[in-house]
Amino acid sequence: MLKVAIVGASGYTGVELIRLLLNHPQVEITCVTSRQNAGASIDSVFPSLAGRIDLTFDPVDVDTIIRKSDFVFTALPHKAAMAVVPAFLHAGKKVVDLSADYRLHDVDVYEAWYDKHTSPELLDEAVYGLPELYRQQVVDARLVANPGCYPTSIALGLAPLLENNLIDAASLIIDSKSGTSGAGRSAKVGSLYCEVNEGFKAYGVASHRHTPEIEQTLGQLAGKPVQVSFTPHLLPVNRGILSTCYASLVQPMDTAQLQQLYAQRYAGEIFVRVHPQGELPNILHVRGSNYCNIGVVSDKRTGRVIIVSVIDNLLKGAASQAVQNMNLMQAWSEDSGLSDLPLYP
């Protein structure tokens, strides 16, 4: 059994990692840390796990984590991950980092959008952990930067078109909606029930921190720099992301041709489901799963293509994708511990 540590496990992503790994046939959770909950039993913080795990939260002590584990998931805030990840790598541990600290390869871009980077020497080594695009690199990696939730839904939605140079990359407009769990578990006024329920708003317009990550990945797919107009919105639901991407086609294509392109591109991907022509995704149909559902439509009147992509932001957008990456890094079946179907309704 692989001994696994989850560093920073008191948030929604952390509890989802615990839940998934408790059901993983090749993993034993040996260390779970939390600064604010150190010393508390895990099931006292997360009653949903009662009777399934007999551990307490450890403080974030690097030496203890190294001693107790073979593989480390870091689910810490941005800037906090880079303070501990180098030590884990130096000790010979493989790491999947769920923060943004190693997603951007250009240190200047990271520092423009986040803060000073204290281990920039690892940025070139870190593999961007979107298996459907970078599977072999993940297999060979010791440090995987788990993608953000919005970028995951967007990159999977646009990859077939950008890989085949079928759209004008300069025309890209991306409109995304996320459930409130994307804002995390910490208390804040904007996440209160009365602030969110029955409301719907845009936020981070032209300034969301996922923008450079989106542009980096889309640029790699296109083989040239890409800039996008990206507007996220807050949905009054617990979980789920729906991204609608718009782009101008460089040559006429009808919906049937586009659907065939997507079906062929993702034919071998167990976690990407392409909808038949005439059907579009719903976040309700991926909730609680590692699936990404995609639908595509040609707007002949405007010469544009419209792609709709949905994921569970806490799973394919975070925890289950991290487990998928671990499976690849360990040369295990990619869907090990991830075979649950979505919850419905």
Swiss-Prot record:
**One cellular component term from this protein's GO annotations in UniProt:** cytoplasm
What protein name is recorded for this chain?
N-acetyl-gamma-glutamyl-phosphate reductase
Keyword vocabulary terms for this entry? Amino-acid biosynthesis, Arginine biosynthesis, Cytoplasm, NADP, Oxidoreductase
Q: Where in the cell is it found?
A: Cytoplasm
Describe the family membership recorded for this protein in Swiss-Prot or TrEMBL.
Answer: Belongs to the NAGSA dehydrogenase family. Type 1 subfamily.
Reactions catalysed according to its record: N-acetyl-L-glutamate 5-semialdehyde + phosphate + NADP(+) = N-acetyl-L-glutamyl 5-phosphate + NADPH + H(+)
Kindly indicate whether the keyword Oxidoreductase belongs to this entry: yes
Question: Organism source for this protein?
Answer: Syntrophotalea carbinolica (strain DSM 2380 / NBRC 103641 / GraBd1)
The major lineage groups are: Bacteria, Pseudomonadati, Thermodesulfobacteriota, Desulfuromonadia, Desulfuromonadales
Q: Which Gene3D superfamilies match?
A: Dihydrodipicolinate Reductase, domain 2 (3.30.360.10), NAD(P)-binding Rossmann-like Domain (3.40.50.720)
Task: Please name the NCBIfam families in this protein's record.
Answer: argC
